[in-house]
Amino acid sequence: MITSPNLPPEMQREMLRRMLTIRRFEERASADYLAGKIYGVVHCYIGEEAVATGVCSALGTGDRIISTHRGHGHCIAKGADLNRMMAELYGRQTGYCKGKGGSMHIADFEIGMLGANGIVAGGISIITGAGLAAQMEGKGGVAVSFFGDGASNAGPFHECLNIAATWKLPMLYICENNMYAANTAAAATHALSDVAARAAGYGIPGVIVDGNDVFAVYQAANAAVERARSGGGPTLIECKTYRWRGHTERRGQADSRDRAEVEAWQRKDPIALIERRLRDQGELDDGALQGMEGDIMAALEAAVAFAEASPFPLPEHATDDVFAA
């Protein structure tokens, strides 16, 4: 059962569109990676689309986020350009980082996407600094840290929650608990079953939501955003979810997880849940869904064509853009 939303129908349909865009982008990225067209490594966000979409739907254009190694969904949910994203995955000059960052290091400061980070928990400190900057700016901005259950065991998580709570920084800490850090089950490394319980140690709210229910995620994030904007300080939100794919997209990669567990979570598909809700409300039919899918696939084909037509970075530019000035 998905949460009953009190949102305009057009906003609900936009949430579905974002989630479908993330799913189709990831499917194409995986296929192109396995075909040898994308370099480096790809971590798919399939199954977790409701988290990025629900949180980013509660944000304004001036709010800032930071992502993880599994970051394509956050970029798309925050409004990133598909052409530049795909070009970056393809390692082309027209990509967000001129083809030098790849899948794990996409950034677009203009939309408030401060980047993704290949180091587990590496972004938490950076975005907490952005929260301090937002507080000092005094314009009501908030900062959002996305991270996984594995990162919640790292030092930066605890250090940043402590300082954010002490200084009442306008922060949202979003734990995407997909139950595994790479191939290690959270149950094997967490003394408590809920990451959100750790919020009590810092005197801040710890909220648990169904990470497959985009409306529940939105409601929790929206309440936390309102609290942060009003000076109430940070909130830790734990989104219980699941990644459908292995840790990375690799041909022949063994998945240590129980197949029955994977299939059980796939039956709780976050996209199917929101589709069903919109149909029940009379806000979506087959024609509208097919039109939405068609637009998304056309945009992805255009993004791939843009990437393939773009040049690779030149070797003599390898050290360009290392420093800000």
Predicted regions and their residues:
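A short, conserved beta-to-alpha structural element at the edge of catalytic cores
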Residues: 167-187
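Short gly/pro/ser/thr-enriched loop/turn and capping motifs at secondary-structure boundaries
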Residues: 73, 179-182, 216, 243-245
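Charged, compositionally biased N-terminal leader segments and the immediate start
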Residues: 1-14
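Cofactor-binding active-site loop characterized by glycine-rich and histidine/acidic residues
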Residues: 27-30, 37-167, 185-191, 196, ...
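A glycine-rich, aromatic-flanked flexible loop/lid motif
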Residues: 167-169, 187-203, 240-252, 267-270
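N-terminal glycine-rich anion-binding loops that anchor highly charged ligand groups
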Residues: 17-33
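Conserved thiamine diphosphate
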Residues: 135-139, 191-223, 267-293
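Glycine/aspartate-rich loop-and-adjacent alpha/beta segment that forms the canonical ThDP
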Residues: 227-325
